[in-house]
A protein has these predicted regions:
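Intrinsically disordered, low-complexity regulatory tails of plant transcription factors
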Residues: 150-151, 235
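Short gly/pro/ser/thr-enriched loop/turn and capping motifs at secondary-structure boundaries
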Residues: 119-121, 150, 170-175, 189-191, ...
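Generic beta-sheet signal
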Residues: 114, 144, 167-169, 183-185, ...
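Hydrophobic helix-and-loop "lid/oligomerization" segment in the mid-to-C-terminal part
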Residues: 2, 10-140, 160-161, 211-435, ...
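Acidic-glycine-rich active-site phosphate/pyrophosphate-binding loop
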Residues: 75, 171-184, 516-521
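Mid-to-C-terminal polyanion-binding domains and interfaces
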Residues: 75-81, 312-316, 322-356, 409-573
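A short acidic, amphipathic alpha-helical/loop segment
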Residues: 152-156, 369
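Short alpha-helices
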Residues: 99, 175-216, 221-233
């Protein structure tokens, strides 16, 4: 894929601000410019950014209903009521359940957890789950990463004498469920200043408030921060402010003393012995936690995350690793089928969105396929499969387009839907799928801009090879953890040449291993361009080209840097 490069040279005002900030922080203008672009303009803000402090976490009692939630939990414990921690079957839900269950279990034994079966119960609160709670004597359900739209289900639970505390981060409807307390920073009446917590983050704030109210030292929560880091990375929420603090300290824990369950996954992934990043969570750890819920039942992942014995955890980790291998095979097959449909249908090539459906696609994998199609075609995408006389779908969007609002515009055709700006899920009658497709595509056509369907690469700065040093790479690491709203800085260098040894590599000859020289300074650097072998012929033609890249540590030669090439284009100068 060739990107449109979005790069604006710094204004004189920005240059001056970067120079002043760089002088105060003893930092190069390049790094200071990156801070200015992130709207970090003062010395104190920069120190908070580079050294996030747990003491700067927001008071959890600023969240609407937090005092009510803590009081109800205290009452349940005082009365020795049975408590059920209930959560979604994805990474965010599983880590949230593990965090809340592990923390409360230290102080209270009459507690259990429950993850609904994706295939038998579907998303969110299920009647089967409530019946299980009723049969086992549960009086309070703490529900995490779902529940904000479960009006009928929670009314049913209420009729059985079961109370709910909802900890969710998805967009609520105008009418909310009759829960005892609803913790959700996206509530329009919620004054909590940070709106981008994930489900596990909301669960953490609840436990933080409970600890504060009961004079439990905050240090008892710190061993659970690795769950927060995993959920923040996997749920792709903005890594700023509160999330940056939680991710920073959670990642630190993941690298030094992870929980037994996460350690077993790290070992199964072959990641032990190296410094873990948010990317390792997104591409290695997260998919394995997700795999059990995609292929069978997510409870296995929570069993693993709360396990205290390493040998038992390792056995479970091997089990979910097998699920992940199966998921990858199905994912590859479904993506090829979906891609084939788009390629064959001429009309689809001109639409601003993609809606695909097939009776045989696996429900647990359609979200991944939607993500892949969005990356390939850069259009809002919905992939649906059949479940009896119902259709279940997953939606993914492109930067700047609110797919939740697009789905909401068709709500009269839907039985259920939920999510947020860039990802959502929906359920409708199978015989309504075509009408939904037409309405959804019409809405997208009316509301999306051409720029939003154009692959865009945001360049942070132009740089000469001579300025790319090991010291710079080490300084760039201080900007981590990376993620939405704090992406890894992308640089560009114009007029570079092949130094003569660049070659195509990889099992399927899909990558290029590069040795490049900068025309300005004659500095030579190594790089890798994943999936860009189509550019090899041009590179070997001895003509100049421009590259966009991130600056990485060479994992084989620790004292050297390596460029990870994001895009290659002919130089037009």
């Amino acid at each position: 894929m060739h990107f449109k490069w979005n790069y604006e040279s710094p204004t004189p005002e920005q240059q001056k601000a970067a120079e002043e900030l760089g002088a105060k922080l003893n930092m190069s203008p390049v790094l200071a410019h990156l801070l200015i672009k992130r709207e970090i303009t003062t010395e104190s803000a920069a120190k908070r950014f580079f050294r996030p402090q747990l003491s700067d976490l927001i008071n959890p009692f600023l969240m609407k209903d937090m005092d009510i939630a803590v009081d109800r939990l205290n009452d349940a414990m005082g009365r020795k009521e049975r408590i059920l921690v209930y959560g979604d079957y994805d990474v965010d839900g599983c880590t949230a359940v593990a965090l809340v269950y592990k923390f409360l279990q230290q102080f209270y034994s009459n507690i259990d957890y429950y993850i609904p079966d994706r295939y038998d119960e579907g998303y969110g609160v299920s009647k089967k789950g409530i019946d299980f709670a009723h049969q086992t004597g549960v009086k309070l359900i703490i529900i995490l990463d779902c529940g904000i739209k479960a009006i009928q289900e929670i009314e049913y639970a209420k009729s059985l004498g079961i109370d709910f505390i909802i900890c969710d981060h998805h967009v609520p409807d105008d009418v909310m469920p009759p829960a005892v307390a609803i913790l959700n920073p996206k509530r329009p009446d919620d004054p909590f200043p940070f709106k981008h917590l994930c489900g596990c983050g909301v669960g953490f704030k609840f436990m933080q408030a409970f600890a504060k109210n009961n004079n439990i030292p905050f240090s008892r929560l710190i061993p659970l921060l690795d769950f927060c880091a995993v959920s923040i990375a996997a749920d792709i929420v903005p890594v700023v402010d509160e999330n940056r603090i939680l991710a920073f300290h959670g990642l630190k824990l993941l690298n030094t003393n992870p929980s037994i369950g996460l350690k077993s996954i790290i070992d199964i992934c072959g990641l032990n012995g190296r410094e873990l990043s948010m990317s390792d969570i997104v591409f290695k750890i997260g998919p394995r936690i997700n795999a059990s819920g995609r292929m069978e039942n997510g409870k296995l992942s929570v069993d693993l995350l709360v396990e205290r014995d390493y040998s038992s955890a390792l056995r479970m980790a091997r089990h979910i690793n097998e699920y992940n291998k199966q998921r990858k095979d199905i994912d590859k097959q479904m993506t090829e089928e979906a891609n084939g449909i788009v390629s064959r249908l001429e009309s689809m090539k001109h639409n601003s969105s993609i809606v695909l459906y097939d009776e045989g696609w696996k429900k647990g994998v359609i979200g991944i396929v939607a993500s892949r199609l969005t990356e390939i075609y850069f259009r809002p995408t919905i992939v649906l499969t059949r479940d009896g006389d119902m259709a279940t779908g997953s939606a993914r969007s492109v930067t700047g387009f609110d797919i939740y609002s697009a789905i909401k515009s068709c709500r009269d055709l839907l039985l259920n839907f939920g999510g947020h700006t860039y990802a959502a899920g929906l359920t409708l009658k199978w015989d309504k799928v075509r009408e939904f497709r037409d309405r959804f595509q019409h809405y997208v056509e009316e509301h999306i801009s051409p720029q939003q369907t154009e692959p865009m690469l945001n360049i942070d700065a132009e740089i000469d090879f001579k300025d790319i040093t090991k010291h710079l790479q080490a300084d760039l690491k201080r900007f981590s953890p990376f993620g939405p709203c704090n992406q890894k800085p992308i640089f560009c260098t114009n007029r570079v040449y092949d130094y003569g040894t660049s070659k195509v590599v990889g099992r399927e000859q899909e990558h290029i291993k590069l040795e490049l020289v900068d025309s300005k300074s004659s500095t030579v650097l190594n790089g890798i361009a994943f999936g860009q072998s189509a550019a090899a012929r041009y590179i070997k033609s001895k003509r100049s080209f421009d590259i966009a890249f991130t600056i990485e540590e060479n994992i084989f030669k620790k004292n050297q840097v390596q460029l990870q090439i994001e895009d290659i284009r002919p130089n037009e100068g």
